[in-house]
UniProtKB/Swiss-Prot annotation:
GO molecular function, one term: mechanosensitive monoatomic ion channel activity
UniProt name for this protein: Uncharacterized protein YgxB
One Pfam entry name: MS_channel_1st_1
Record keywords: Sporulation
Higher taxonomy: Bacteria, Bacillati, Bacillota, Bacilli, Bacillales
One GO-annotated biological process of the protein: sporulation resulting in formation of a cellular spore
Length: 552
């Protein structure tokens, strides 16, 4: 029965050594006495120990709280001091001039960073005073990392400050030079700006571009100092490419600027020279003023010279850029245009010659037809106009002849510049013109013949009942001519032929029915007379057969 009690006793007493004799009894008695003592005094001992432990730690807690409070106050003081010091430098106003104030300025951000670093130091002291090393160790590691990064940050800050100073100086120089070197007059002369406000805006824009470009040049050094290799490496490569490309870009821009100035100068010289020698009078004599409404021939020639100069200039600038993806297709296209320029010039000369020849043909054809009395043809066709027309018939024919001549020259010009699709269209139109002319001739002849037949029938046929025969004959001839003209034009030949046959058959049927129904009495009398004549002829023949003549 003592075995379970003995095991508990051994565990609770830490297996204290007991003499072998009477071991079981001694162990049991000692365990019982110890057990009864703990039950009575344990609570009092625990309360006293806890209270004394708290009392021993209370000074550390008070000191830690004082350190936390004082450290927080010092951190706030440092934050305000840093903010005021940075505000006096006006960094944001210099870096972001002309922009709306941001919600978080650089002064506020930097002062907050300093404030939180000071708070980290205060928390480290607070937790160390309380002997909470486990809680303080992350803050210590964080502060150690910040302290280790301070040299890099200072180095990056110095590089950024140097870059900002260099950018500010260069931007200031650009602005001053732009305002003092009579740039405004040159920009107005080149028609790049119109007002003084635009000039100031252009100069300010140029100075800001210089400012940010210089900052970008210093930015890879800042990133390298901060050891941000994930960003600094690609950004450094990009900046190296940009810096290597800038001389090419500057050279290309310089080439374009010089070429543009030369092209403008040549254009103005050619335009003024051609205007002084009377090119506009020549254009008016050639009839080109109609096509040059808002400009002049000298201005057009000057613009052509301007374009011819700018094309090789642009080719040279693109070659200088050495950007294969852009320069090669563009250079190839411009070279193709340059190779086509002789053909284009010949084509332009042909078109101008066609316009001049068309004008000459128009005047000649109109004059010949007018002297031949062609303007009275419409009157002979019965198509007199109630009010006099702006253009006479001879002028209309002359204009058609002019269009045909211009079209012929234009087709040849398109053939020279190898615009085959347009050549096919122009050739098709020219090939179709004879059909149109023949159709117009047939229709005009039909109108003339119809009017002539109407007049002849009206003069020959008297009587009210035959009054409608003359118009019917006229419009029958006109309809016949109209169908012949459509057939000549090839407009739905099957339908036109079928319609003509149907109309002609209708006329024949109508004539037959009208003759059969309206001329029934006349036909019966005519047939009776014809029958009597036949009978009389037979009787005379029989008499001759019965009384033959006597032969001698």
């Amino acid at each position: 029965m003592y075995e379970p009690a003995r095991q508990k006793m051994i565990v609770s007493l830490g297996q204290e050594k007991i003499p072998p004799a009477h071991s079981s009894v001694c162990l049991l008695d000692k365990w019982v006495n110890t057990h009864h003592t703990t039950k009575k005094e344990r609570y009092q001992l625990n309360v006293a120990d806890v209270f004394s432990s708290y009392l021993s730690k209370l000074p550390n807690v008070i000191i830690a709280l004082l350190v936390l409070l004082i450290g927080w106050a010092i951190a706030k003081i440092i934050e305000k001091a840093v903010y005021k010091g940075l505000s006096k430098t006006k960094i944001d106003d210099k870096l972001f001039a002309g922009k709306k104030p941001s919600r978080y300025s650089s002064e506020k951000v930097i002062s907050k960073v300093v404030y939180f670093i000071a708070l980290i130091i205060v928390f480290i002291l607070f937790f160390n005073i309380l002997h909470l090393t486990t809680v303080a160790s992350p803050f210590v590691s964080m502060l150690s990392a910040i302290a280790a990064a301070i040299p890099s940050v200072l180095k990056a800050g110095l590089i950024l400050l140097l870059g900002w100073a260099a950018a500010s100086v260069l931007s200031f120089l650009v602005k001053k030079i732009g305002m003092k070197l009579n740039t405004s007059d040159k920009l107005r002369k080149w028609n790049l700006v119109s007002e003084g406000k635009d000039i100031h805006q252009a100069v300010n824009t140029a100075s800001q571009i210089v400012f940010y470009l210089v900052l970008l040049v210093f930015l890879p050094g800042v990133l390298s100092s901060l050891k941000i290799s994930g960003i600094s490496g690609p950004f450094t490569n990009m900046m190296e490419s940009v810096l290597a490309f800038l001389p090419k870009l500057f050279a290309a821009a310089l080439i374009v600027l010089i070429g543009w100035l030369v092209a403008r100068l040549v254009r103005d010289i050619i335009t003024n020279f051609l205007a002084s020698i009377g090119t506009e009078r020549f254009a008016a004599r050639m009839g080109l003023s109609i096509y040059l409404k808002d400009t002049s021939l000298s201005a057009v020639i000057g613009t052509i010279a301007y374009v011819l100069i700018m094309i090789p200039v642009v080719i040279s600038a693109l070659d200088q850029l050495d950007v294969a993806g852009i320069s090669k297709p563009a250079v190839s296209m411009l070279n193709t245009i340059l190779n086509m320029l002789p053909n284009i010039m010949i084509a332009i000369v042909l078109v101008l010659a066609g316009i001049w020849a068309g004008k000459w043909v128009k005047s000649m054809v109109s004059g010949l037809l007018h002297r031949a009395g062609f303007d009275s043809v419409l009157g002979k066709m019965g198509m007199e106009a109630g009010t006099p027309a702006k253009l006479s018939l001879s002028q209309v024919v002359g204009m058609i002849a002019q269009i045909i001549v211009i079209l012929l020259f234009t087709a040849e010009a398109l053939q020279i510049v190898r615009l085959h699709f347009l050549v096919e269209i122009a050739t098709g139109i020219i090939a179709y013109l004879p059909n149109v002319l023949v159709a117009v001739f047939i229709l005009g002849l039909g109108l003339y013949a119809g009017e002539l037949v109407r007049k002849v029938l009206a003069s020959m046929i008297k009587g009210q009942e035959f009054k409608s025969l003359a118009p019917i004959a006229k419009y029958t001839i006109i309809a016949l001519a109209f169908f012949m003209a459509l057939d000549q034009l090839g407009v739905a030949a099957t339908i036109v032929n079928s319609a003509f046959i149907i109309v002609l058959s209708g006329f024949a049927l109508a004539f037959g029915l009208s003759f059969g129904l309206g001329g029934k009495d006349f036909a019966s009398r005519y047939l009776s007379t014809f029958e009597r004549k036949m009978q009389n002829t037979e009787i005379e023949k029989n008499r001759k057969n019965q009384n033959p003549p006597n032969d001698m």
